[in-house]
Amino acid sequence: LQLETLFYIFMSGAGMFFLLKHFQLHPHAALLGSVAYMLCGFNIDSAQFLNWIAGTAFLPFVILNYYRCITEKSLRYTIYTGFSLYLLFNCAYPAGFVITLYLLLFFFMFLTSPKFLSNIISNWKSYLAIHLTIAIVFILFSLPAIISYLQSLPLMERGSGAGLEAAMSNALHPFTLSTLTL
């Protein structure tokens, strides 16, 4: 668990370094910015919540790859964006993922402005292709997690505990006994 936490903290610094380096910051400034992001108060204070740390690890990669796929209209960065969103969805806190989607929406509007509507109307096919590719890559990678979530959704009860029947169903399955030998 400690190695995983350190891995996520390191990944947040590496992602921020690549993001800052892409915008042609001096390497020392990019290194300083990535160390500041990696060791910011949120990461240090939230180290006990691993999924929050995972969110900070993959957020710079999502922003960098999305920026590059919108500005360069490259299939490679579109696939990277879908995969980065998958990592964020699969590892981070769910609210962080939703906030990131809103952030990407505003980021898209900012990148395609000042003539937002005229730019969207004139290039709508390319933007639609980019976003459909991102969605397809994201869904293909996330499909096991989505199916697992949908299967476990009926078993979740908010505000009340699990009933006795649900708690005792398959309590001593043979596959669970195998964990005793490990």
Show the residue positions of the predicted features.
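Membrane-embedded helix bundles of polyisoprenyl
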Residues: 4-6, 10-23, 27-114, 130-149
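Short, intrinsically disordered/low-complexity patches at protein termini
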Residues: 68, 122, 170-171
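Membrane-interfacial, low-structure loops and terminal tails that flank and connect transmembrane helices
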Residues: 114-127
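Periplasmic/ER-lumenal interhelical loops and adjacent helix-loop junctions
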Residues: 127, 135-182
